[in-house]
Regions:
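Short helix-coil boundary/hinge micro-motifs
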Residues: 1-148
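Glycine-rich loops and low-complexity Gly/Arg-rich segments
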Residues: 116, 126-127, 161-163, 171-172
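Short, non-ligating residues that shape and space the ligands of small metal-coordination modules
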Residues: 148, 164, 168
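Short, glycine/charged-enriched secondary-structure capping and boundary segments
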Residues: 152-153, 173
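Cysteine-rich micro-motifs
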Residues: 153-163
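Contiguous alpha-helical segments
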Residues: 172-179
Length: 179
């Protein structure tokens, strides 16, 4: 494991959230936000309304900027995010995780918790200087983000669909050149 479990989950959640904005947008309803929330084991306050959905959707470009920034820019963004949220890191334990960090109260708005948890995860990325683990999908027609947690740093595509599309295109190109 490259990072602690909570860091990896926070990064995976942030990448999934950012990628939900790629066409077709997959975060257009409160039900879809509920699915995202459950998929990444978020806990705490949920308003479950359109205002919460709109706030989370508006966060996507902010997180994209953070996750695609260089090291020095990331530090500035992380510090601003944590200061704006009044973050105070504390160790907590709740199901399904053992001891891990939360930096805002569980009753903070979901958008604040997402922002702060992503910023806290990026602290580990900055400290380990592992920015090569974050990138943009190698598919020319896709702008999705890639989080590469593989041991050999081999992940190039944001999804299986993008990887398969490129494998098929490469196969067809090879077959076409044989004729």
């Amino acid at each position: 494991m490259l990072f602690t479990h909570d860091t990896e989950v926070s990064l995976q959640a942030a990448v999934a959230l950012v990628n939900s904005a790629e066409p077709p947008d997959t975060l257009t309803s409160v039900d879809e936000l509920d699915e995202w929330y459950a998929a990444f084991s978020y806990t705490g306050r949920r308003d479950g309304d359109r205002a919460e959905l709109d706030a989370v959707r508006a966060l996507r470009p902010v997180l994209r900027e953070l996750l695609t920034s260089d090291r020095d820019s990331a530090v500035e963004l992380v510090n601003a995010m944590l200061a704006d949220a009044g973050a105070l890191p504390q160790l907590v334990r709740h199901e399904p995780f053992d001891w891990h960090l939360h930096a805002v109260p569980v009753d903070a708005p979901l958008v604040t918790r997402i922002t702060v948890e992503t910023a806290m995860a990026m602290i580990d990325v900055v400290r380990a200087d592992e920015f090569s683990r974050l990138g943009v999908c190698a598919d020319d027609g896709c702008g999705g983000l890639v989080l590469d947690l593989s041991r050999n740093r081999s992940r190039r595509y944001c999804s299986v669909a993008c990887g398969n599309r490129n494998a098929v295109a490469a196969y067809r190109a090879r077959q076409g050149s044989k004729r």
